[in-house]
Every structure is written in C-alpha cells, then in structure tokens.
Amino acid sequence: MMKFRFRRQGADPQREKLKQELFAFHKTVEHGFPNQPSALAFDPELRIMAIGTRSGAVKIYGAPGVEFTGLHRDAATVTQMHFLPGQGRLLTLLDDSSLHLWEIIQRNGCAHLEEGLSFHPPSRPSFDNASFPAGLTRVTVVLLAAGDTVVLGTESGSIFFLDVATLALLEGQTLSPDEVLRSVPDDYRCGKALGPVESLQGHLQDPSKILIGYSRGLLVIWSQATQSVEHVFLGNQQLESLCWGRGGSNIISSHSDGSYAIWSTDTGSPPTLQPTVVTTPYGPFPCKAINKILWRSCESGDHFIIFSGGMPRASYGDRHCVCVLRAETLVTLDFTSRVIDFFTVHSTQPEDECDNPQALAVLLEEELVVLDLQTPGWPAVPAPYLAPLHSSAITCSAHVANVPSKLWARIVSAGEQQSPQPASSALSWPITGGRNLAQEPSQRGLLLTGHEDGTVRFWDASGVALRPLYKLSTAGLFQTDCEHADSLAQAVEDDWPPFRKVGCFDPYSDDPRLGIQKVALCKYTAQMVVAGTAGQVLVLELSEVPAEHAVSVANVDLLQDREGFTWKGHERLNPHTGLLPWPAGFQPRMLIQCLPPAAVTAVTLHAEWSLVAFGTSHGFGLFDYQRKSPVLARCTLHPNDSLAMEGPLSRVKSLKKSLRQSFRRIRKSRVSGKKRTPAASSKLQEANAQLAEQTCPHDLEMTPVQRRIEPRSADDSLSGVVRCLYFADTFLRDATHHGPTMWAGTNSGSVFAYALEVPAATAGGEKRPEQAVEAVLGKEVQLMHRAPVVAIAVLDGRGRPLPEPYEASRDLAQAPDMQGGHAVLIASEEQFKVFTLPKVSAKTKFKLTAHEGCRVRKVALATFASVMSEDYAETCLACLTNLGDVHVFAVPGLRPQVHYSCIRKEDISGIASCVFTRHGQGFYLISPSEFERFSLSARNITEPLCSLDISWPQNATQPRLQESPKLSQANGTRDIILAPESCEGSPSSAHSKRADTMEPPEAALSPVSIDSAASGDTMLDTTGDVTVEYVKDFLG
C-alpha cells in the first residue's frame, strides 16, 4: 500500500511545455578582458580587431556589441594572427606551427565565427611525411602576400608559400637559405648560417615584393614575380623586427642591443653595407632589445617611430614600455604589464602618400590601451569594452536590475567627471566594424565589483559590451602607509627617460585591509553600503556635486557581552578626521567600525527604515544611520564550540569551567541514552534548556585566563560566522500584527529573528521621525543538521517574495499580500525549508542530497517570464552547488523544475564568484579578468547579435571542416556542451520582450562565502529527512 502512496507521479505534459517556455540554459557572452592574451591583429578595411590567447581562444571585436568568439580544437597558444583585409577571414598560427583559417559566416541573419581550413606541418618531415620538404620545421613568422598567398618563415631559415584558398604548399616556390646566400658576399658568410626567419613584411605599393629579415641581421628584398633577390642589406646586429617605409624607399630595423637602423632601398643592386641612420634611443649604456618597431609617415614631415622595449638594462630593464618618437618629442609610455603587441590605425589606401596615423592600440598582458595620436599630448581614448575588470583583484560582486533612469544618469555623470583633466581625447573609439543588431535594452542593469584596493566599480551590464561607468574609492577616508611612499617615489622620479604612466591596471594593493567584501545599493534612494576586510562599514550617498564634509564614525563592539577576549589580527583602519574633500559621486556619510576588526561576511541595507545590518565571524550588529546610533550587537561565538577552540579562534578556558562542562555533557548523554523516544515537547524543552544554558551569564563570569582571538577567514567551518542578513515586514509576534523584522543566519545553522520598533514616517515624508529604533529577539531557530544558513527570504500570502524597500510604496511592484499567512524560506547548504509564520512550523522542504559531496553555494529568487505570454511569469529559486550544477525550484512548493551543468566542479573560484540576477541570468569568473554570462530564462537572454558589411562568399574555403560549436568558455573549458545557437526570427526578440513592471519582486538574498569544492554525485531527494528544528520563542 505504501508504494502506491509514495509513488512518483508521471510528468505533466502541460507543465513540461510550460517549462520550455520559461527555462532555457545558454552561456551567452564573456565580459571583460581576455585572459593571457598572446596575439593581436587588425583589419583596417573592416575596422575589426582580433585577440588570441594562450588557451587557443580567438576573439574578434568591432563596434560595441559586435563580438565573435572561437576556440581552437587543440589547446595551444595563438602566436600570430593575420586578417585577410576586407574578407572577414583570419589566419592564426599556433605554437605547434599549425595554421588555421577562420571565417565570419552569415547564417539566419546573424554572423558567426567558424574555423575552416587548417595546415599541420609534421614535426619530422623526412620521417613522418615524405611529401613535405625537409626544411619545413617550426614556423616562426607568417605573412599574407598579395592577398592570396601565405608566406611561412621557419626556424631553419627556409621560406615556404601556401595557397590561402586551400592552405596547400605551392610547388617549386620554396626559398632556401642557400639560394639567399648566393647573393651575399663571401666575407659576410663566414661559414655561418643565416639563422631563423625573424620577420616578413609585404610592400604596400608592390605586393609581389617581400622583405625578409634573418636572425643574424641579414635583410633581403625578394621578388615573387621574378623569383629572385632584388636587394641585400648586410646587417650585423641580431634582428628583432622590420618595417617598410610608406613609399618603400626606406626600411627600418630594430635589434637586440636596443638600437634601430634606417636603410635606403635606392642605393642600387649591390649589397648595402651600412644603414643611413643608426641610433640607440636610450644608450650609451646596454639596453634591452627593441621587440617591434613601426614607422608611420605624416604630411607635416614629422614622422612617427613607435617601438616597444629598448630600455636601459640596468636601470629600467623591468619596465614595460612603448616609446613614441616624433621629431624632437619622445614619450615613454610606462605600463604595469607586459607588452604583447601593438598597431596603428592609419590610412592604408595605396593612393595616399602618407600614413597619417590616428590612433595607437597597445595590447598588454592585462589590458588594452588606445591613444589618440592626433590630439596634443596623445591622450587615452576611453574604451567602451575590454576594460580590465581585474585592474585590482575582484573580491566581491553584486548585480542591480531595473535601475531607474534618473539614478543611471547621475552615475554616468559622476563617472564622466572622473575623466582626467584636460578632458580625454576627442577621437571616438577607432574599432567600429560591424553592426549591432540587438535593440536597445528596455531596462538597465548594473554590475558592481568590489576590489582589493578599496574601490567599487560600476559597470553597464545591460548589453553585450560591459562598459565602465564609475569608480568609487574608499581609500581616501583612511590613513595608510602608502601615502608617504607614493610622495617619496614621485619626488625621486627622474626626468629621463620621460616616463608617462598609462593604463589602469594596478596589481598592487595599498593596504590589504582596504579590500571590499560586501556591497549593497538602494536604487531608489541612491544610498549604498560598502563593507571591508578590516570590519569597516561605510554608508554612502550619491551627490552630483563635489563637497567637503566630515564623516561620522561609530564603533560597534560585537563582543560586548564577552569579557577577556584579545584580538590578535590586523589593526583597524584609522580614518582621517576633520573636513575632507569628496568628488561628485557616492560620498561617505557614516563609518561604522566593527570590533574586533574582522572581515565583514554579510551586509544588508533598508533605506526606508534607515537601517543597516552587518555581520562578521564574531557576530552581527544593527545600526541606525539616521540617528547615528547602534541598535543591536549580538555575539554569535559559542563557548562550547570545539571548532572555535581548535581553529584560528583560540581561547584558553579555566580547568574549573572545563570540568563543569564535561560533567554536564556526561549527564546529558546519560539522560538521552535512557530516553530513546522522547516526545516532541520534551525535545523542545531540552533544546530551550540548552539554549538558555549557552546564554546563561554565570558561565561567563569565572574566566581567570584571558581568551585570545586570532584572525580567520570567512570561509572556514567556525560556527560564529554570520552568513546572511535580511530585513522583512512580516508577522513575527502574532498572526494579526505585522511589523519590521531582521533575520540573521550563521554557519552553525542558527537563525535569529528580531522584531524591530521603527518609527513610522509621516504621510508623504521620506524620512522617519528622529526616535530610537528598538530590537527585541523574537525567534531563535536551530536547524538540526546544523548546516550553514545560506539565505533567508520571507514569502507573502500568495507565496511571493516581499518587494524591495520603496518598490510597493512607489507603485513599482505589486504590493505584498498581508492578509494571508506569511512563510519564511531558509536555505542552508544541505536543504531548503519553508516555515509558517509566526509559529515557525515546518511547511515544506527539499533536501538537496542524501549523500556527502553536494552543498549549496549560491541562492537567489528570480522571476522567469514566458516567451509565449508577456503577462505570465513565475518566481523561482535558483541554486548553484559546489559541483557547478544549477537547480531551479518552484516557490513556495520547492518542486524541482530544471537542472543544468553550468561550471566545472574543479573551478572553485568560478563557483564562489557566481552572481544571479533577478531576471534569471548570472555571472561568474572564468578567469581573474573575465565574467562568463549565462541565462536560465528562455525569454531574457543577452547575447551578441551582429553582422559584418562584407560580401559573403558562396563557397568559401571548401572543403570545410566540421563546424565549430558555440564557445562555452574561451579559457579552455571543453567539457560543457551547450545547446546550438539560433538566430531565427527578429534578433530583438530575446531583448525587447520583458515581463510587465508589476511583477513578483525579488527578495534580497545574501551571497555565501567561498568554500572548497568536494566531489560526489548529486542526488535529489525529498524524502527521508526526519530532522527536527528547535525553535525558541522569545515573544510569547
């Protein structure tokens, strides 16, 4: 009989169809700067740029929103990239000497990047494949000549030619070193080889001429038309780079000793022995090699010479520089990361006599910098994308959806005022190829990232291009040691070389205590809370004009009811006193300092009540920032916690107290052993007795030995860590009167619910009266399995989460149902459970797994709108586990809806950094500099929809290899397979359709701390959980 009672019901076809209309998993776009870039290319005709990485990724960028991404099948480093100008095709060279031809193909109204042909030379041609010539070894350099020929320079000094249409070797056109040596005088040979081919350059006016540079220093002009050597330049210095002059009458070469030379090609056919100009810009002392050099002509006659490297080896050998020389002006662009490559945006039309460069683009290991070469001072051009997310290491992130247009405009205005003076370049972004087919988003989304240097950056996450808007810095409020070091460094800086700091990547943090741990933003009042590593909690407010004011400071001792503790960790940050100047933007109004100054692990803001709650590893506090007074401080450390004794939080207890607690444990174990099946009431009484005993003051009186607290991270298993905080207007005292409440969840499975007495605001007033806020402990819930509480949310009478502050009062969301019974959803690392309020009795639950290994890491309530009906939407619970799986559950029934594999379980940092949005999307870090964006919603999808204005070939590069799948992760993750991409119908369908404004609101759920991933199989189980929650009611 029981098997029929518990038999699972069959799938409802109607519900399954509805699921397909609500849920769909896509990895859509990668935001940020490519991780570990290794190659760069630019198409001057289409105005698109390509970046290759060490993991084999290929990323092509055009105008904002125009992006194409591909991944080589072999995880090898991309060493060189070359566009076929105007054709939408890209040739890549990997470090295994293989060539790959990529094409941008039009399909279903959208453009896609696909890999076409490939060429793999054998590692040992004489043994592996007799059809390949013996000299075809490692490829060192590639050139596209005359548009239809690929020229390969090799390590052996041989040069080979391939047909670009088939990537097949052209017979009888190989140029061997012996043939070149015949044109070289005998005294130059000296029995030595020419060395590898270092550079191949095509002539702009005559594509049949190829400039060849060998490592030993020999330069050769080879005529492909006549198959002969036209000119020889006998260089003696080891060659690094070559560049033609505009008209082809001059050649510039750079060398390993930090010098460059200019050679004239008008000296006739005999070998040229000496260059016309030889100079070492930073000599006479030994210098590093000039890795790459460019010569760009101007109509004014003052030509540009741009090169990387060449710095004095002893003094500045560790600098990463690109030097720009024009006439008598020399500027040394000083970067904080290694220079990968650079190019200029200039005229390439054959009829133009001069280059007239407009911009210089420098690809660095950690960022992309574009300089305006037409404006005096050569200022930087603001980048609409590819901004380095990791300019300082990311420590936390948050997403804010549906940002009001007024707040958006104020944030953008504050960001524009942060531009350096004089104003930035008037030149617009020069990489403008392609067309973005996606419509303008109907709502604005902000991505907030907290960083190690104490900054919070605001990003426009509304579309494909993640655009920087504004940067908030908190370091100016505090006294740090770096202030004196910076002034000293500026004082001793020499005038030569003329260094100029460029770029925003700064890997060094001034003070690790400045690191941002949590952020919270109220989008209706423009108030913000920022919490840091040293226990600092800042309350800020957006101002449109600069101001000068003092910041109020208040200390909140979270251990005020525990005597004899000594903090052995870092000191708190000392704030500056007196009037301080603040730029336009978010300006601090209140500084709350937690004591001990441990890292803040949870924070929440309720602007309507002017309250902020914060938690650390020692407890949590509630602060009224309107009256600038603390309301509550609660310590969550348990004296009997063995983990707290053994972990970094070490406390020495007296022998008398230890013996007393040991006898109590023995007595409790005897009682529990005799009574195997106690009644529920006796269990509750015993639990209450234990709770009363833990909080009994007489246990804390006799402490003859001082207890010492050491710093510890927020991701350990100590029970006192506060994991989440939550405000709600709900029923806690009784079922007829609702009011403000605050909820706190800890690492030990404890949930504290406080009833708040908040003075009500007058009719039409924004601020509440200046009366004190009171907090009374109402409920205390101890989960039996003691798993860490990840998130808490209150559901109204219709089972929907409560709206955010000001949402209902301003008619921006449907008012909550305050007539029916409320419920509270408590999400722990092991299970989800819904309790009725105010009795706090279990209503429904879902146990994520019955086995060890699967734990909840991130939780959020999101609204999923139907693709078929604009009026239908469901609020569901999205959950990410430590195995990288995403589960979606119905609310409040907690029935599983869909399950997707999202992140590799080995990617611990990616799982820890995941952030869900309120419309069913998410972000997580796939590298220190890149966010992967994914969507769980079938309606709300943000992905590249773009095209290129080129003539699409009917049968391009046939035969074609297997079509490349849509890239899931360009950092080399290959074990996650996505559904095929589709662009059928209007490209705006995924962006323009949104649910109505009156939609179920999202409850603010706190993020969880980082934890280590464990292996294990996921098992979804809704039965077999017989745990009992202990509830203590303090309100009666």
From Swiss-Prot:
Q: Which gene encodes it?
A: LLGL1
Give the GO cellular component terms, alphabetically.
axon; cortical actin cytoskeleton; cytoplasm; early endosome membrane; Golgi cis cisterna; Golgi membrane; plasma membrane; trans-Golgi network membrane
Protein's name in the database? Lethal(2) giant larvae protein homolog 1
Q: What does this protein do?
A: Cortical cytoskeleton protein found in a complex involved in maintaining cell polarity and epithelial integrity. Involved in the regulation of mitotic spindle orientation, proliferation, differentiation and tissue organization of neuroepithelial cells. Involved in axonogenesis through RAB10 activation thereby regulating vesicular membrane trafficking toward the axonal plasma membrane.
Segments carrying the region annotation (Disordered) are 667-688, 980-1002
What Gene Ontology terms for biological process does this UniProt record contain? axonogenesis; cortical actin cytoskeleton organization; establishment of spindle orientation; exocytosis; Golgi to plasma membrane transport; regulation of establishment or maintenance of cell polarity; regulation of Notch signaling pathway
Cross-referenced SUPFAM superfamilies, in alphabetical order?
WD40 repeat-like
How is expression of this protein distributed across tissues? Answer: Widely expressed. Expressed in brain, ovary, testis, with moderate expression in lever, uterus, lung and kidney.
Q: Which organism is it from?
A: Bos taurus (Bovine)
Q: Which SMART domains match?
A: WD40 (SM00320)
In which residue ranges is the amino acid composition biased (Basic residues)?
A: 667-677
Bridged cysteine pairs (disulfide): none
Q: Answer yes or no on keyword Membrane.
A: yes
Tell me the classification of the organism that encodes this protein: Eukaryota, Metazoa, Chordata, Craniata, Vertebrata
Q: Give the Phosphoserine positions (modified residues).
A: 662, 964, 982, 989
